[in-house]
Design a protein with these regions (language model features):
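Transmembrane beta-barrel domains of Gram-negative outer membranes and organellar outer membranes
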Residues: 29-209
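Predominantly the C-terminal beta-signal and adjacent terminal strand-loop region
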Residues: 30-40, 329, 333-335, 340-382
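Residues that define the transmembrane beta-barrel architecture of outer-membrane proteins
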Residues: 107-109, 162-167, 192-196, 215, ...
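Transmembrane beta-strands of outer-membrane beta-barrel proteins
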Residues: 111-115, 179-181, 198, 214-223, ...
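Transmembrane beta-strands of outer-membrane beta-barrel pores
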Residues: 117-121, 185-191, 202-204, 223-229, ...
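Outer-membrane beta-barrel translocator domains and adjoining extracellular loop/strand segments
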Residues: 126-130, 192-198, 230-236, 270-280, ...
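Extracellular loop and loop/strand-boundary signature of outer-membrane beta-barrel proteins
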Residues: 154-157, 184-186, 227-232, 320-325, ...
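Detector for outer-membrane/organellar transmembrane beta-barrel domains
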Residues: 220-327, 338
Length: 382
């Protein structure tokens, strides 16, 4: 009974360790739910870009437009596509398939159930440069922020988290001919986001222990996909294609430790829904909406002065504050190295994943700072 009796104790310790990682997530405060509707460019007046909040102020008080000799619909918010691209790129890096496993599969009939905790560095104070030359702190503007005692959210996230935690329940099942299928569902800390996805890999070379081939490492290729749920504002899907090598080392007590190393090409796909850049203003109420004209324009009973004596126009400017971002298509090159430990039922792992190249070497709109992810895993191997 000796060695086997120690398994429950070790498994309890491992699960307790992973649980402590989950609890530690509460130390990060700030409300990291994406708010892409805040990532807007301000209009120009006399060729000069206006300050932050100007288009929102005009939407709330259309009479301000007449003071600068313009109409409200000429002073609408427009999407800051560069800021959105940076937000999607860094969030996609954090939520992408982690490739946290060795090249050797679980074997036909093998099964692993585990919990993975991953922490990804983001550029919390990162700045993007918009098409008009304006600078935006995309994590400050693009995430929810704190909640006031009256239940209202702040206009910006003044202290975005520098780490994004993702806690994933994974199941891996060995298949014939060296294939393995993974399923994953995860929660993104300090948000309402969840990730779901699956991985498939094929061990090209595995299991040789004797003879000349016994000196070669196990080699596998694989692919994985993750997508998010929990947000009606944006859609994010990541696809990874990887190759890795590993070599199991059997220890004296029959435990197996397996170091591994690999490369992943990551593809990030992001899109936005139609967003209201001025959620505090009811466009239909403001215009006195009565229906749609033959041209498709809203029919409004309320009017607003143009600045010219006696002239008014329909107060329909806020309808122009519905925005959609350009689709985001990004490629990232990532390296990873890690180690797994297996003893009877107990399965543990640790991995470090990192950018091999600067993001802006592939897309000049992106921030140059490289990202990394540290992952820990604990579970059972059947």
């Amino acid at each position: 009974m000796g060695s086997f009796a120690r398994v429950p104790l070790r498994l309890t310790v491992a699960c307790g360790f992973v649980a402590s990682l989950l609890v530690s997530a509460s130390a990060y405060a700030g409300g990291m739910d994406p708010t892409p509707e805040r990532l807007v460019l301000q209009p120009k007046v006399g060729g000069v870009v206006q300050g932050a909040g100007f288009c929102q102020a005009v939407a709330a008080n259309p009479a301000l437009a007449a003071k600068v000799g313009m109409l409200p619909d000429q002073l609408a918010c427009t999407p800051d596509n560069v800021a959105f691209k940076n937000l999607v790129s860094e969030l996609g890096f954090a939520l992408a398939p982690s490739t946290m496993h060795s090249a050797r599969t679980t074997g036909f009939g093998g099964f692993v159930l585990s919990l993975e905790a991953s922490y990804t560095h983001i550029n919390a104070d990162g700045v993007s440069k918009g098409a008009d030359g304006s600078l935006t702190q995309y994590w400050h503007a693009g995430t929810q922020g704190s909640v006031a005692p009256d239940g209202t959210y702040s206009a910006a996230n003044n202290s975005p988290d520098s780490l994004i935690g993702v806690y994933t329940l994974k199941a891996r099942k060995g298949l014939p001919f060296g294939f393995e299928l993974d399923g994953a569902v995860g929660y993104v800390s300090n948000t309402s986001l969840w990730t779901i996805g699956a991985d498939l890999r094929w061990a090209i070379l595995e299991g040789f222990r004797t003879g000349p081939m016994g000196y070669f490492p196990d080699i596998a290729i694989g692919t994985g996909v993750r997508t998010i749920t929990g947000s009606s504002k944006m859609y994010l899907t990541t696809v990874g294609i990887d190759v890795e090598a590993s070599k199991p080392i059997t220890l004296a007590d029959e435990a197996v430790i397996t170091p591994y190393i690999g490369y992943q090409q990551l593809f990030i796909y992001g899109n936005s829904a139609v967003l209201d850049a001025t959620p505090g203003v009811n466009a239909m109420q403001q215009c006195g909406y009565t229906g749609q004209q033959a041209s498709g324009a809203p029919a409004c009973t309320n009017k607003v002065a143009t600045g010219t004596a006696g002239q008014t126009v329909a107060n329909d400017g806020d309808f122009n504050n519905n925005i959609t971002f350009d689709p985001v298509r990004i490629q990232r090159n990532r390296g990873f190295l890690g180690v797994t430990y297996r003893y009877e039922l107990l399965y543990l792992g640790a991995q470090f994943l990192f950018d091999l190249t600067s993001p802006n070497s592939i897309d000049p709109d992106l921030n140059s700072t490289r990202q990394w992810t540290m992952s820990l895993e604990g579970g059972v191997f059947f």
